[in-house]
A protein has these predicted regions:
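Acidic, PIN/NYN-like endoribonuclease modules and their adjacent C-terminal/linker elements
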Residues: 118-143
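Short, well-structured N-terminal submotif of metal-dependent ribonuclease cores
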Residues: 1-53
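Acidic, metal-associated active-site segment
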Residues: 92-112, 126, 130
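Acidic, metal-coordinating catalytic cores used for nucleic-acid/nucleotide bond scission
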Residues: 38-39, 93-97, 117-123
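Catalytic-site beta-strand/loop segments enriched in glycine and acidic/polar residues
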Residues: 78-84, 106-116
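PIN-domain endoribonuclease scaffold, especially VapC-family toxins
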Residues: 37-92
Length: 143
């Protein structure tokens, strides 16, 4: 959501995208998680949109034993890979929703939508790499 707002889908340029998100949620085809909501900065245009438009169920809770268990498995896997220490620390940082998003999708049999692509690089843990490792489907906004 944050990258979409900054790049291709600015509110002033493409308001239909944001209406589409709400329609997809209403149809039961789209959710996000509480950790993503928590990353959105107060005073930001996206913050205002979330709190004025997104229903409370739009952001699923990651506070379940099943999600925490999957997240833990992902942290163990990431730490066992050849990623740089900085990449591992960034992925595990309390403010980073990426691992939680994949864990939530795994537990709930959902598809992760991301602008990231698979990468052999070791400087950043990419969502598609974690999805592949844990059997979670992913796509980008154009799929």
């Amino acid at each position: 959501m944050m990258r979409a707002k900054r790049q291709h889908y600015r509110f002033c340029f493409c308001p239909g995208f944001w209406d589409f998100l709400l329609a997809q949620h209403s149809a039961g085809r789209l959710r996000s998680i509480d950790k993503v909501r928590d990353q959105i900065k107060a005073g930001d245009e996206l913050h205002a949109w979330v709190y004025n438009n997104a229903p409370s169920k739009f952001f699923g809770s990651t506070r379940s034993a099943a999600v925490a268990n999957e997240y833990g498995k992902m942290m163990v896997w990431v730490n066992g890979q050849a990623y740089t220490g900085a990449a591992k620390a960034e992925f595990a940082h309390a403010d980073n929703a990426d691992g939680w998003l994949v864990a939530f999708a795994k537990v709930n049999s959902l598809t992760v939508v991301t602008h990231e692509v698979l990468s052999n690089g070791m400087k950043r843990v990419k969502i598609p790499n974690v999805c592949d490792q844990f059997g979670v489907e992913y796509c980008d906004t154009y799929d």
